[in-house]
């Protein structure tokens, strides 16, 4: 039996026009994350790291405990979903990073979050 933690991450992003102010170089994006435990042992998300890059190449790093104030436990076959946001000075950018996790055997491991786009639908980069 393979007890290696297996966690999948999916992200969908959207531009929030009602909270944005392009004339002030303020572009607000929401992103919805689904974290699925496809392994055979329970896991807990204990920390996060994000690298946010705007359309001019300016990078911002964000790290901290948990996500949206929680450190969720995810049972085998289970999932955890949350929504958060980012504010950029450009109408396009990217995010990527990782989650720091711990499994039921108290082993720490990292789950990579592949790069995803933050963009107004009318902008192509």
Curated annotation (Swiss-Prot):
Q: Which Pfam families match?
A: DUF525 (PF04379)
Tree of life domain? Bacteria
Question: Which InterPro entries does the record associate with it?
Answer: ApaG_domain (IPR007474), ApaG_sf (IPR036767), Uncharacterised_ApaG (IPR023065)
- Please state the span of the N-terminal signal peptide per the UniProt entry: none
- What are the ApaG domain coordinates in residue numbering? 1-125
Protein name (Swiss-Prot/TrEMBL): Protein ApaG
Q: Can you cite a GO biological process for this protein?
A: error-free translesion synthesis
Per the UniProt entry, what species is this protein from, by scientific name? Erwinia tasmaniensis (strain DSM 17950 / CFBP 7177 / CIP 109463 / NCPPB 4357 / Et1/99)
């Amino acid at each position: 039996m393979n007890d290696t933690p297996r966690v999948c991450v999916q992200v969908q992003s959207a531009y929030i026009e009602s909270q944005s102010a392009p004339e002030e170089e303020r572009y607000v994006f929401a992103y919805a994350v689904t974290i699925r435990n496809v392994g055979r042992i329970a896991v807990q998300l204990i920390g996060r790291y994000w690298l946010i890059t705007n359309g001019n190449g300016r990078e911002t790093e964000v790290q901290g405990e948990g996500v949206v104030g929680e450190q969720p436990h995810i049972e085998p076959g289970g999932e955890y979903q949350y929504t958060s946001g980012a504010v950029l000075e450009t109408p396009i950018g990217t995010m990527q990073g990782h989650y720091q996790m711990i499994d039921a055997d108290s082993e720490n491991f990292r789950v990579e979050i592949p790069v995803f786009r933050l963009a107004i639908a009318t902008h192509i980069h």
